[in-house]
């Protein structure tokens, strides 16, 4: 008789380790689906992530280690768990028993952004999800602004130059190359910890930033006395700020620790031609030949904005391979009529003007070059003429029209020689990115006037088109794709609603569709502070509130 087959004991499948959390998330998802709220997607993603987690969770705060669990959702779970325990339910959240109660309505809007990844876990004693590292520029900025906030004689804000100087005073010896590329100041602005107002920019702490800065000061053992209540602290009570953090802040602002200064006779003015103007077919190589024929000192390099700029290049640099260069306050964008026509059709026209106005150079020239017959273009001549007129009257550009490429080269040669005479005898000094220049300061009071200019590296790096963008920047670009939304209108919209989630939450809070259509109509836009208007507000509400396909 054959021996009986011995079968191993079958391992039972584990029960759901967090049934209460699963039940509550399911309830909230179903309720959001019934009310047609977009938070249903947040709950669904969190529910899927929770079901894959094999271990029990004791609180909603512990669920933050899972994907798609943000501060708002974890707080909702903790509040629901507390209500469950108060009503006599099991104390363990993984108990199968629970209480069926509707989700708190006041918290649904808080999880609009809960699917965003948490950048850092808080340390002991900290609240919230963001806690800047000890050797980070963000920590330095918060502490410096906190000192200014505590100063009874201060303005409770700092300009960018003042902010850089305060950080440099805390660590005057910065090792070259020790800066990291993470833009600390921009990160704090996006986290709504630092507020930027006015022009030139002023930086101050928001209520959330003030709370975090106070906890940072307490964590470092700083009291009200040694945090400093004045702009100048005693030497023995200064807080040590890491050198790398100060260098990181300087790198983010696009400045050098030692400003570049070029005295008369130590530099030459030359024309920089974008490499895109020299490649390709047609008449592009002819431009360089014309410049050479006119004996214009020029160089060809990659420009991220504009087609022509002028730089003051150091003549006797310490490093011949890397001479110091300062960008003069003039930039030229060249457009042939056929290129102007195509750029208007595909939207590049508005975007290029918007980027030119933000490049840091104040004297902008729009060079329009005739090319062939106007009747062969895709747009009528009146449309092109109106676009050029708007560029001059509304955008404030200087518009120059030329007959052909030879006349364009002659105009560039004339500008080059004019700038060489204009800056002759001037002392040039670099300035931080984002601060206004003063090319005419001291022209009447000093035989050697001082001009503050951007370095070429800062100018070109600040104009990169495809650099990493925040949600706010992407949202602004998305709004500008809507017909009628200019750069100024998009800026006004993102000042009120910085993310799509905040705009959708505002739409969800409206009682009627009519209220949704007029939600944005009273937002002030532009220098004249005119209303956005009901027509554009209705268009945007249809775009963001329609669940079906747009018609």
UniProtKB/Swiss-Prot annotation:
Effect of residue 530 to A: Decreased endonuclease activity. Loss of endonuclease activity
Subcellular location: Nucleus, Nucleolus
Identification of the protein by name: Structure-specific endonuclease subunit MUS81
Keywords: DNA damage, DNA recombination, DNA repair, Endonuclease, Hydrolase, Magnesium, Metal-binding, Nuclease, Nucleus, Phosphoprotein
Stretch list, region Helix-hairpin-helix (2HhH): 471-545
Function: Catalytic subunit of two functionally distinct, structure-specific, heterodimeric DNA endonucleases MUS81-EME1 and MUS81-EME2 that are involved in the maintenance of genome stability. Both endonucleases have essentially the same substrate specificity though MUS81-EME2 is more active than its MUS81-EME1 counterpart. Both cleave 3'-flaps and nicked Holliday junctions, and exhibit limited endonuclease activity with 5' flaps and nicked double-stranded DNAs. MUS81-EME2 which is active during the replication of DNA is more specifically involved in replication fork processing.
Effect of residue 277 to A: Loss of endonuclease activity
Enzymatic class: hydrolase
Family: Belongs to the XPF family.
Pfam families: EME1-MUS81_C (PF21292), ERCC4 (PF02732), MUS81-like_WH (PF21136)
Gene giving rise to this polypeptide: MUS81
């Amino acid at each position: 008789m054959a021996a009986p087959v011995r079968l191993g004991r079958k391992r039972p499948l584990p029960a759901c380790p967090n049934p209460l959390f699963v039940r509550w998330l399911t309830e909230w998802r179903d309720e959001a689906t019934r009310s047609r709220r977009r938070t249903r997607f947040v709950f669904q993603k969190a529910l899927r992530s929770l079901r894959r987690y094999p271990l029990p969770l004791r609180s909603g705060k512990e669920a933050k280690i899972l994907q798609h669990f943000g501060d708002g959702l974890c707080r909702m779970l903790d509040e629901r768990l507390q209500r469950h325990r108060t009503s006599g339910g099991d104390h363990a959240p993984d108990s199968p028993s629970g209480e069926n109660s509707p989700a708190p309505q006041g918290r649904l809007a808080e999880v609009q952004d809960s699917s965003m990844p948490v950048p850092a876990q808080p340390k002991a004693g900290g609240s919230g999800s963001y806690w800047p590292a000890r050797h980070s520029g963000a920590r330095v900025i918060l502490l410096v602004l906190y000192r200014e906030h505590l100063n009874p004689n201060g303005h409770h804000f700092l300009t960018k130059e003042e902010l850089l100087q305060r950080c440099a005073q805390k660590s005057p010896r910065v090792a070259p190359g020790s800066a990291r590329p993470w833009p600390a100041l921009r990160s704090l602005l996006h986290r709504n910890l630092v507020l930027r107002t006015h022009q030139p920019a002023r930086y101050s702490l928001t209520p959330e930033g003030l709370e975090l800065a106070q906890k940072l000061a307490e964590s470092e053992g700083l009291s009200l006395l040694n945090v400093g209540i004045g702009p100048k602290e005693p030497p023995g009570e200064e807080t040590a700020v890491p050198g790398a953090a100060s260098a990181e802040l300087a790198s983010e602002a696009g400045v050098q620790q030692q400003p570049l200064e070029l005295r008369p006779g130590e530099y030459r003015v030359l024309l920089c031609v974008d490499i895109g103007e020299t490649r390709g077919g047609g008449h592009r190589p002819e431009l360089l030949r014309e410049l050479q024929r006119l004996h214009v000192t020029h160089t060809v390099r990659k420009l991220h904005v504009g087609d022509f700029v002028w730089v003051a290049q150091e003549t006797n640099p310490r490093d011949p391979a890397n001479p110091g260069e300062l960008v003069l306050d003039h930039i030229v964008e060249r457009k042939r009529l056929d290129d102007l026509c195509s750029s208007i059709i595909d939207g590049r026209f508005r975007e290029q003007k918007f980027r030119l106005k933000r490049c840091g150079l104040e004297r902008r020239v729009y060079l329009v070059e005739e090319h062939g017959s106007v009747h062969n273009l895709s747009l009528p001549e009146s449309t092109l003429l109106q676009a050029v007129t708007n560029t001059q009257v509304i955008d404030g550009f200087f518009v120059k029209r030329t007959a052909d490429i030879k006349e364009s080269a002659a105009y560039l040669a004339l500008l080059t020689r004019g700038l060489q005479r204009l800056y002759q005898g001037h002392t040039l000094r670099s300035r931080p990115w984002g601060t206004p220049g003063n090319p005419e300061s001291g022209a009447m009071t000093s035989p050697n006037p001082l001009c503050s200019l951007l370095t070429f590296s800062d100018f070109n790096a600040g104009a990169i088109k495809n650099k990493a963008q925040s949600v706010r920047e992407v949202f602004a670009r998305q709004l500008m794709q809507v017909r009628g939304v200019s750069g100024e209108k998009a800026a006004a919209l993102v000042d009120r609603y910085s993310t799509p989630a905040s705009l959708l939450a505002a739409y969800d809070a409206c009682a009627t569709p009519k209220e949704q259509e007029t939600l944005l109509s009273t937002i002030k836009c532009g220098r004249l502070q005119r209303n956005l208007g009901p027509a554009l507000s209705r268009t945007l509400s249809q775009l963001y509130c329609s669940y079906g396909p747009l018609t």
